Curated annotation (Swiss-Prot):
Signal peptide bounds: none
Originating species: Staphylococcus saprophyticus subsp. saprophyticus (strain ATCC 15305 / DSM 20229 / NCIMB 8711 / NCTC 7292 / S-41)
One MF term in the entry's GO annotations: ribosome binding
Gene Ontology terms: cellular component: cytoplasm; ribosome
Gene3D superfamilies on file: PRC-barrel domain, RimM
Major subcellular location class: cytoplasm
Protein name: Ribosome maturation factor RimM
């Protein structure tokens, strides 16, 4: 099974480097040189690339692919989704830890079982992760025990008890 690990937001320089906004965990492992990625393209066949280099720059992940040395060879992929086989999910997790790919796409419900929206993104803040939940509005839900009460990965369902003002 493939999981989404990021989106190509732009190119950088003239030597074929791309800027990637990650929506994945374990980026140090996923974006290492030698790792295989799949670029999903709208209404076209997916493309496979091997990562040649990786670095961080201004909060974005900067990648080059083997065999790509020119901006003209990569520019057409701006806006496309980067996927990877789910084999990195073998990393052992602690209690109450989940892979981003297990959380993104889940529907979030409040105490009354009213759907709030779907988790579309996860931000790491240092103290705890924050989930972006899009429904009628966009909400920022902290992943803390006082708020997140139950996560059913198989059922793609998350139950929360919103703090005062969280859903205003």
């Amino acid at each position: 099974m493939k999981v989404e690990i990021g989106k190509i937001v732009n190119t950088h320089g003239i030597k074929g480097e791309i800027k990637v906004k990650s929506n994945s965990d374990f980026t140090e492992t996923r974006f290492q040189p030698g790792e295989l990625v799949i670029i999903e393209r709208k209404n076209k066949e997916p493309l496979e690339f091997t990562i040649a280099s990786y670095r961080m720059h201004k909060g974005l992940h900067m990648l080059t692919f083997e065999g790509i040395n020119n901006i003209n060879d990569i520019e057409y992929l701006k806006g496309e989704t980067i996927m990877q086989e789910r084999d990195h999910e073998e990393i052992e997790l602690g209690e109450h830890e989940f892979y981003y790919s297990d959380i993104i796409g889940c529907t979030v419900f409040d105490d009354d079982d009213t759907p709030i929206g779907r988790v579309t993104e996860i931000f790491e803040t240092g103290a705890n992760d924050v989930w972006v939940v899009k429904g009628d509005k966009e909400y920022l839900i902290p992943y803390i025990a006082d708020v997140v009460k139950d996560i059913d990965v198989e059922g793609r369902r998350i139950q929360i008890t919103p703090m005062e003002g969280l859903l205003d």
